[in-house]
Regions:
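Conserved alpha/beta-hydrolase catalytic His-Asp/Glu region
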Residues: 133-187
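Alpha/beta-hydrolase fold catalytic core
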Residues: 1-15, 35-38, 71, 75-76, ...
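Active-site loop/oxyanion-hole signature of alpha/beta-hydrolase fold enzymes
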Residues: 28, 32, 41-81, 248-251
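Catalytic active-site module of serine/aspartate enzymes centered on a nucleophile-bearing elbow/loop
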Residues: 226-257
Length: 257
C-alpha cells in the first residue's frame, strides 16, 4: 500500500510511525526539529489520516506498507521510531527486514501481548455512535463525544481525525470498521523467530503502565542490544507530555550512540 507521508530535511533517513487514532500531524513538531540533522519521513498508517483504507489491519500488513515506503524512496540503514501501535509495527519491520533498519526506537509499548483496553474499544464505539448528518461545526460533534469520552486530551486527539466534505459536513478519516473488527489484533504480541541485534532504545512514560519491569525479558529476547529510558512525569503520550525531554533522548541516541 502506498502511504501518504510528510518529509522534512536532508541526511540519514528517519521514519516516525504514529499510534492508534493518530496521524502524521501529531509528530510534525518533533519531526521538523529532528530534520535539522536528518531526513525525516512521517507516514499516515493504513486506515488513518490521508492513507488508503483496507479491511486487513495487522502489524505485518502495516510493516509491509512501511517497507514499501522505504523501497520506493530508496532508503537504507533507516532509524525507525514508533509510538504505541506504531512501535509494534516498527518492531515487526525490524525483525522481518533487519537489513533495512539501522537502529530502532520504541516509545511506550513492549513487544508483548496486552489485554484489549476498554478505553480504546470505548473510543471506537463512541465515534461510531456520532451522528455526522447535518452537523456543520466541530462543537456539534464534541457535544456528542463528551458523554462517552470525558478526557479532554483524548477527545482532542479524536477530533483531529475529522475533515470537511464537499458539502460542508464532516467525515472521519479513520476506517472505524476495520479498527473495530481488528481491535484484538492491535493488542497482540510481536512474533518472530529472529532477533534484531542492532541498537534499540525503549522509552517509557513514568506515569504509564504500558512498559513495566516484567517486560524486560520479552524485550531482550527479541532485541538483545536494547536499553530502556524512563521520562518520569510523562504518560503514554510521551511526545505530548514531554517533547523537550523526548527530543533530547532521540538526538542523543541517534547522534551520539
Amino acid at each position: 500500500m502506498k502511504l501518504f507521508f510528510r518529509q522534512f530535511g536532508l541526511g540519514k533517513p528517519v521514519i516516525i510511525l504514529h499510534g492508534l487514532f493518530g496521524m502524521s500531524d501529531n509528530w510534525v513538531s518533533i519531526g521538523k526539529q529532528l530534520s535539522e540533522h536528518f531526513a525525516v519521513y512521517i507516514p499516515d498508517m493504513r486506515n488513518h489520516g490521508q492513507s488508503p483504507h483496507d479491511d486487513v489491519f495487522s502489524f505485518s500488513a502495516m510493516a509491509d506498507d512501511v517497507l514499501e515506503l522505504i523501497d520506493d524512496n530508496y532508503l537504507g540503514n533507516v532509524t525507525l521510531i514508533g509510538h504505541s501501535m506504531g512501535g509494534k509495527v516498527a518492531m515487526q519491520l525490524a525483525l522481518n527486514h533487519g537489513d533495512k533498519v539501522g537502529r530502532l526506537m520504541v516509545i511506550d509499548i513492549s513487544p508483548g501481548k496486552y489485554p484489549v483496553r476498554h478505553s480504546q474499544q470505548q473510543v471506537v464505539e463512541a465515534m461510531q455512535r456520532v451522528s455526522l448528518t447535518g452537523i456543520t461545526s466541530r462543537k456539534g460533534i464534541e457535544d456528542q463525544l463528551i458523554y462517552s469520552i470525558s478526557d479532554f486530551r483524548t477527545r482532542q486527539l479524536i477530533m483531529k481525525n475529522l475533515f470537511r466534505t464537499g458539502n460542508n459536513t464532516f467525515a472521519w478519516r479513520l476506517n472505524l470498521e476495520a479498527i473495530h473488527h481488528n481491535m484484538d489484533r492491535l493488542f497482540d504480541s510481536v512474533e518472530s523467530d529472529s532477533t534484531f541485534g542492532k541498537p534499540v532504545l525503549f522509552i517509557r512514560g513514568g506515569q504509564s503502565d504500558y512498559i513495566n519491569n516484567d517486560d524486560r525479558e520479552k524485550i531482550l529476547k527479541l532485541f538483545p542490544d536494547a536499553t530502556l529510558e524512563t521520562i518520569p512525569h510523562a504518560g503514554h503520550w510521551v511526545h505530548a507530555d514531554a517533547p523537550v525531554e523526548l527530543l533530547k533522548i532521540m538526538n542523543d541516541f541517534m547522534i551520539l550512540k
